[in-house]
Amino acid sequence: PMIKLELQHIYRQSDDKFISVLNNIRNNECDQQDLEELNAHYKEEFVPEKNEQYITLTSHNRLADQINQEELAKLSGKMHNVKAVVKDDFQQGAYPTEETLTLKLGAQVMFIKNDTGEDRKYFNGKIGVVKELNLDKHQVLVGFKDGSEDVVVRRETWENIKYKYNKGEDKIEEEVLGTFSQFPLRLAWAITIHKSQGLTFEKAIIDAGTSFAAGQVRSEERRVGK
């Protein structure tokens, strides 16, 4: 028989009031008190202080791209375009980050992969700032506002894997069809709701005005730890 499990413990948020509001939104039970709690955080003309590392969560790729490019243009210094190395069969729709990653000193970036080394210095969704670019050595130095140690970032390789069943040996085997190599980073002044799934941010600006699907706003709000 099928076993049903219900996950009840919330790890992302710890504030009981915030958890209650999120649950009421999910269950379509939002009351006036919940609305007042949400509206208390609405600031139409809000502009974050420089280096506060807010990230804007929005509904469309074009809006996230526009914000990222506008913020990148505000930075002085040379723009560096880093091309990914794609080998064999790796479909463009499956690229984990931009094929051409555009960076500048001071750019706000987000890691898109967990650190698999022993030190675990970064994780998927961690936000930092580009401090040095040494592309001749294929290195980017990223610093963090939380005081954690700077990280020298190198290219990572993703594999396009096909799984097949080996009947003779009764086991599943992997076949690597192609690879994608790029720095595990993306510009992070803004990101879409879709790409923020599973991530947690300490500071976020929620752009709810262009949400078009049921549950999008609640999904945005749940990205924020509190």
Question: Where are the model-predicted features located?
Answer:
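Conserved helicase motor core of P-loop NTPases
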Residues: 1-120, 131-135
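C-terminal accessory regions
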Residues: 110-148, 152-226
